[in-house]
């Protein structure tokens, strides 16, 4: 895949080739599971319609959604799809490729991998609608995956001393929060999950870009090199804190309505799941605020910081549109919620009354 070469050839770490190989092997494992699941779905459609193979194989999503799937096969398809997308999301325990790539890969590639939640989208768009009975029966498995990912990644993030690795674990933890919202099977939870997918695509990507700006200036994103950044880089610090506060769900930013809806949806279904979501949000605030205080505030602890310079105009311009969006979505979330309301209703109806 292209990312193998992008990470292996243009990564910033000494272990970039190993990181590229690790990423590729993980993606291959997930891809094989997805291929098997899709092949089973297509073969089942051919069997149901008495069509010849391979001529009768159909990979059209609307067709597959309308094709009956026996319970045993549906459970197998569900598990294969869940595993494949859990690797790509990633969910614990399939997450180890992301922190490695975050430390070794080029910033622009890591920003894409951290920001885009294609694995979560796959679970929402394909795994549960294609196997609705199994998804409803085993929603507790998805809830467990989400809660463990949310809490475990947050606890690991609390111990990090490097900004890039911290952001990688924060991304994994937020994936867990989104999965908790999806698994709640409530309107609030699903709407919050969709909102959070869009929300964290903006926030995580920009935070990783900011870490790239810091690395370009100082040659490191470890906290031992970062103390007192606010004194030398006030513009970078202001932008960083805006997106950092959005990532922990401060009111007035897009993170607040998304996290609030997920927590409400989880509490509606199961108090333990809701408490897990709430604890994940609290831990998220803990690791982000703690690291930010050490890295940006306080005295300057490294001589390279004094010789550095603040964000340039073109760098600020790159961040301007996402900053406006997270503030707009924070103060006026109704637009996003109205847009995904109908889709959320249709998705939930598919799970509560599976067809055919």
Please state what every model-predicted region is.
Residues 1-73, 156-222:
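Alpha-helical multi-pass transmembrane bundles of energy-transducing inner-membrane proteins
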Residues 68-76, 106, 137-148, 229-239, ...:
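Membrane-interfacial loop-to-helix junctions in multi-pass transporters
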Residues 40, 47-57, 233-235, 288-356:
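Cytoplasmic/organellar membrane-interface segments at the starts of transmembrane helices
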Residues 19-22, 105-114, 221-238, 273-280:
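Membrane-interface alpha-helices at helix entry/exit sites of multi-pass transporters
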Residues 19, 75-144, 168-169, 235, ...:
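Short helix-boundary/re-entrant hairpin motifs in multi-pass inner-membrane proteins
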Residues 94, 160-163, 214-229, 291-310:
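Alpha-helical transmembrane segments
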Residues 124-138, 178-198, 265-273:
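Helix-coil boundary and interhelical linker segments in multi-pass alpha-helical membrane proteins
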Residues 92, 204-208, 274-307:
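Predominantly late transmembrane helices and immediately cytosolic-facing juxtamembrane segments
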């Amino acid at each position: 895949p292209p990312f193998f070469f992008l990470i292996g050839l243009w990564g910033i770490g000494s272990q970039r080739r190993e990181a590229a190989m690790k990423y590729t092997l993980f993606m291959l494992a997930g891809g094989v599971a997805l291929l098997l699941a899709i092949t089973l779905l297509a073969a089942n459609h051919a069997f149901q319609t008495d069509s010849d193979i391979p001529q009768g194989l159909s990979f059209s999503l609307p067709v597959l959604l309308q094709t009956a799937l026996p319970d045993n096969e549906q459970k197998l398809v569900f598990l294969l799809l869940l595993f494949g997308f859990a690797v790509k999301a990633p969910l614990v325990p399939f997450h180890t490729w992301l922190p490695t790539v975050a430390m070794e890969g080029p910033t622009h590639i890591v920003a894409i991998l951290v920001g885009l939640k294609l694995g979560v989208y796959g679970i929402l768009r394909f795994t549960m609608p294609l196997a609705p009975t199994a998804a409803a029966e085993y929603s507790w498995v998805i809830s467990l995956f989400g809660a463990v990912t949310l809490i475990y990644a947050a606890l690991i993030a609390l111990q990090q001393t490097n900004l890039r690795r911290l952001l990688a674990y924060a991304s994994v933890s937020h994936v867990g929060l989104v999965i908790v919202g999806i698994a709640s099977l409530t309107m609030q939870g699903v709407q919050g999950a969709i909102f959070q997918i869009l929300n964290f695509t903006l926030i995580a990507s920009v935070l990783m870009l900011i870490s790239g700006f810091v690395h370009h200036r100082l040659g490191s994103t470890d906290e031992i090199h970062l103390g007192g950044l606010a004194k030398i880089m006030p513009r970078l610090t202001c932008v960083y804190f805006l997106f950092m506060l959005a990532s922990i769900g401060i009111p007035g930013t897009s993170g607040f309505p998304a996290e609030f809806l997920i927590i409400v949806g989880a509490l509606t279904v199961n108090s333990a799941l809701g408490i897990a979501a709430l604890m994940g949000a609290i831990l998220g605030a803990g690791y982000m605020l703690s690291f930010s205080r050490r890295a940006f505030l306080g005295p300057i602890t490294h001589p390279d910081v004094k010789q550095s310079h603040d964000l340039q105009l073109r760098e600020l311009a790159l961040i301007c549109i996402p900053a406006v969006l997270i503030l707009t979505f924070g103060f006026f979330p109704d637009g996003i919620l109205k847009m995904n309301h109908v889709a959320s209703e249709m998705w939930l109806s598919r799970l509560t009354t599976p067809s055919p």
